[in-house]
């Protein structure tokens, strides 16, 4: 159904790209009409059908009514704020806690500049950026799990 362009292996530009490992995605099916008319509507309708099916089969119930006079002992944020909450909870100085929170996105912005991204997009060929990502993920998981524990066990997760 799609129109494919056959590669000309006698083309010196294509040979140079293939020698550098950059020509693998140069030829292929065009996005119009193959993807935009046939594949995308199926994916969109499938996503809508899954959402409607989940809403019908498992509706979310409304919880208990809020009581303003009964405050819980420890209020926890939503799960995606657990690492930041753990940083604020363990650092004694508020200014240092805010600076640590600001340093997280600043550090994430520097990751693409650690190695030459234009040369390779394969993560196995960029070991420094991959290592920074894996260590950052491990630290975020460690802080997130620690935020759910009491303060005396939060940094060691009760393991040591």
Swiss-Prot record:
The alphabetized UniProt keywords are: Chloroplast, Electron transport, Membrane, Photosynthesis, Plastid, Thylakoid, Transmembrane, Transmembrane helix, Transport
The record's GO CC annotations read: chloroplast thylakoid membrane
- InterPro entries, A to Z: Cyt_b/b6_C, Cyt_b/b6_C_sf, Cyt_b6/f_cplx_suIV, Cytochrome_b_C_euk/bac
Its domain of life reads Eukaryota
| One record GO biological process | photosynthetic electron transport chain
**Calcium among keywords:** no
GO MF terms listed in the record are: electron transporter, transferring electrons within cytochrome b6/f complex of photosystem II activity; electron transporter, transferring electrons within the cyclic electron transport pathway of photosynthesis activity; oxidoreductase activity
Q: What is the first-listed, main subcellular location in coarse terms?
A: plastid
> TM segments?
36-56, 95-115, 131-151
Q: Which Pfam families does this entry report, sorted A to Z?
A: Cytochrom_B_C
- Localization: Plastid, Chloroplast thylakoid membrane
| Membrane-topology descriptor | Multi-pass membrane protein
Q: How does it assemble?
A: The 4 large subunits of the cytochrome b6-f complex are cytochrome b6, subunit IV (17 kDa polypeptide, petD), cytochrome f and the Rieske protein, while the 4 small subunits are petG, petL, petM and petN. The complex functions as a dimer.
Tell me, in a sentence or two, what this protein's role is. Component of the cytochrome b6-f complex, which mediates electron transfer between photosystem II (PSII) and photosystem I (PSI), cyclic electron flow around PSI, and state transitions.
Family (UniProt): Belongs to the cytochrome b family. PetD subfamily.
The name this protein carries in UniProt is: Cytochrome b6-f complex subunit 4
